[in-house]
């Protein structure tokens, strides 16, 4: 049997947890008959309470997973009835009789705007109403007769407040209000929900937490977003503290604490040290999302006593941007990794940042004022880094300089390690995204230790006006895993390969797993690889505004596995061919859309 709810599965790939999102219900919406738009008794099986359980996403957020294979046919009679109408654009109110006998109700992704005034749901254990954006008001007595309700999901609805009857739900264990952008206040009566284990307010616009939160001693997950300003930029309903003193340390069972704040909120600056100190004394904390306006606050983290399997730290005071230069897909990439450090508007290379880097799997260096190389942070500190984003660091001239490996005693950091694995630089890195780097000239300077960057799968370079060198021969030898290369608005690049390859190697193919190349706004580009054979498995090519580029399909890239070529029609038709253009290439050519660039 298929249920209408998003299930998020976790699979383990090394250190990375990759979410597999299943839209359970797509199949059901095509197969079920109209009569199921009502309360119904399942044929051959019902939803099992144990099929809904807490799991941990890579970002640290609690989610619930509903598995079809957890449905137990023999449980039909004991579980009673349920309603499922997710994603059917259901707008009509459900009959009172249906509510009366339901055990679970799933009405997500609909256009529900009105709820019954006082439904009698004495057996209801789970109510899912997420993404009903037209739902603005919950009737005052709506929850009066739901004594067994354990899970309530009102995420991404238009509600502005919660009725008092909600805080009488003595059995409630999990309350989801994420993405409720109109919700700004949380009643002190929330402290009456003594059995509550999960409280998710991420994406709501809560002004402050009431001190009564400290009564929720069974809480294992707390997620909250604070926004200290109204839409017109003025402070509204400010209290002295976003989180009252003693609240966090009272929640001794917390395993997950995610706090998102407006960096302009001065209240956070005055309370942040106390909050981080309380959080770092929680013995059970495993997932921690936090904004540190000052680097020195990181010293409160005692890595020997904390067991953080997931963290997402943003460090450095900054103004929240209305428009970000970081594309959404890059933000999503950063979210994929379980331990992420964002360092914004930094100066120098603080030891506290280096300490966090040793535990991080993702690093975002944003608008650093003085650093000249990424390797200034220490290559040994970045052994676990799998995702790296570097942007708007105006002084950075190169990414890695192996000369930085030499310490004060003159012994190389690389040479000082006895084991081969210890000599590798960025050996775990899989994703590298570099953008708006006005002084960047090269990716790598100096010798390239064997297996350095050998796991890199995706490389993107955007708007680096002085960049002249991307790949040297040593780098080419190591990039055996590279699958995708994007270079955009780097006008000084003449070829992505900037080296002379010995004659005996010119017939060999480099970048053996490269499948996708995108070259846009490359005014100085003359050739892709200076005549070197690359990418024998290439499947996708995209060009735009590369006026000097000669035909790369003759002697540089393989066309055997090509599935698509994108470019300007005028450029394509002007390409010169020694024996005429093969017909099959015309079949896979697609004129590029300017919005693709």
Enumerate the predicted regions with their spans.
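Homotypic signalosome interaction modules of apoptosis and innate immunity
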Residues: 1-69, 73, 578, 588-597
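Surface-exposed helical/coil interface segments that assemble multiprotein signaling complexes
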Residues: 4, 11, 16, 48, ...
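Eukaryotic beta-rich interaction modules
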Residues: 85-88, 108-111, 269, 342-347, ...
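Recurring C-terminal helix/loop segment of individual leucine-rich repeat
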Residues: 94, 113-120, 137-144, 154, ...
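Leucine-rich repeat
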Residues: 99, 120-123, 132, 143-148, ...
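Conserved hydrophobic beta-strand positions in leucine-rich repeat
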Residues: 105, 127-129, 149-154, 172-177, ...
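Conserved "Asn-ladder"/turn position within leucine-rich repeats
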Residues: 110, 132-133, 157, 180-181, ...
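Extended, non-catalytic interaction/assembly segments in eukaryotic proteins
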Residues: 348-350, 372, 404-407, 461, ...
């Amino acid at each position: 049997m298929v249920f209408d709810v998003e299930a998020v599965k976790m699979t383990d790939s090394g250190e990375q947890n990759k979410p597999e999102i299943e839209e359970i219900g797509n199949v059901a919406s095509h197969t079920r008959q109209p009569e199921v738009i009502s309360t119904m008794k399942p044929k051959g099986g019902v939803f099992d309470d144990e099929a809904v359980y807490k799991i941990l996403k890579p970002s640290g957020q609690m989610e619930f997973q509903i598995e079809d294979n957890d449905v137990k046919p023999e449980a039909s009679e004991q579980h009673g009835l349920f309603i499922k109408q997710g994603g059917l654009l259901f707008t009509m109110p459900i009959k009172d009789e249906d509510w009366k006998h339901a055990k679970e109700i799933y009405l997500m992704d609909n256009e529900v705007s009105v709820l019954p005034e006082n439904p009698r749901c004495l057996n209801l254990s789970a109510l899912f109403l997420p993404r009903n954006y037209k739902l603005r008001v919950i009737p005052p007595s709506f929850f009066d007769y739901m004594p067994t309700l354990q899970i309530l999901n009102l995420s991404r609805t238009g509600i502005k407040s919660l009725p008092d009857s909600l805080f009488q739900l003595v059995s409630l264990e999990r309350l989801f209000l994420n993405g409720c952008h109109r919700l700004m206040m949380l009643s002190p009566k929330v402290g009456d929900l003594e059995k509550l284990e999960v409280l998710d307010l991420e994406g709501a616009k809560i002004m402050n937490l009431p001190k009564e939160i400290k009564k929720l001693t069974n809480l294992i997950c707390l997620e909250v977003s604070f926004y200290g300003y109204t839409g017109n930029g003025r402070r509204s309903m400010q209290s002295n503290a976003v989180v009252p003193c003693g609240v966090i340390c009272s929640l001794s069972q917390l395993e997950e604490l995610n706090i998102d704040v407006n960096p302009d909120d001065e209240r956070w600056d005055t309370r942040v040290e106390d909050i981080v100190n309380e959080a770092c004394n929680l013995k059970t904390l495993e997932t921690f999302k936090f904004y540190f306006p000052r680097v020195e606050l990181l010293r409160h983290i005692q890595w020997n006593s904390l067991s953080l399997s997931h963290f997402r730290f943003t460090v450095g005071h900054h103004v929240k941007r209305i428009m970000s230069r970081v594309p959404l897909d890059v933000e999503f990439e950063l979210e994929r990794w379980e331990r992420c450090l964002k360092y914004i508007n930094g100066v120098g290379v603080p030891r506290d940042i280096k300490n966090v880097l040793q535990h991080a799997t993702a690093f975002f260096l944003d608008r650093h004022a003085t650093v000249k190389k990424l390797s200034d942070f220490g290559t040994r500190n970045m052994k676990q880094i799998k995702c790296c984003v570097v942007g708007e660091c105006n002084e950075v001239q190169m990414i890695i300089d192996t000369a930085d490996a030499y310490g004060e005693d003159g012994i190389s950091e690389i040479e000082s390690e006895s084991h081969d694995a210890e000599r590798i630089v960025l050996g775990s890195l899989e994703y590298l995204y570099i953008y708006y780097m006005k002084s960047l000239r090269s990716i790598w300077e100096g010798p390239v230790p064997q297996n350095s960057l050998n796991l890199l799968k995706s490389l993107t370079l955007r708007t680096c006006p002085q960049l002249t060198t991307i790949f040297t021969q040593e780098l080419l030898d190591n990039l055996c895993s590279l699958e995708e290369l994007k270079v955009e608005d780097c006008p000084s690049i003449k070829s992505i390969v900037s080296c002379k390859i010995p004659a005996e190697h010119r017939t060999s193919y480099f970048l053996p797993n490269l499948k996708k190349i995108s070259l846009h706004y490359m005014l100085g580009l003359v050739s892709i690889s200076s005549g070197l054979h690359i990418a024998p498995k290439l499947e996708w090519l995209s060009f735009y505004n590369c006026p000097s580029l000669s035909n790369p399909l003759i002697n540089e890239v393989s066309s055997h596995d090509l599935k698509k070529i994108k470019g300007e029609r005028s450029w394509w038709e002007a390409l010169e061919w020694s024996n005429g253009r093969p017909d099959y290439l015309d079949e896979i050519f697609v004129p590029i859309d300017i919005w693709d660039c």
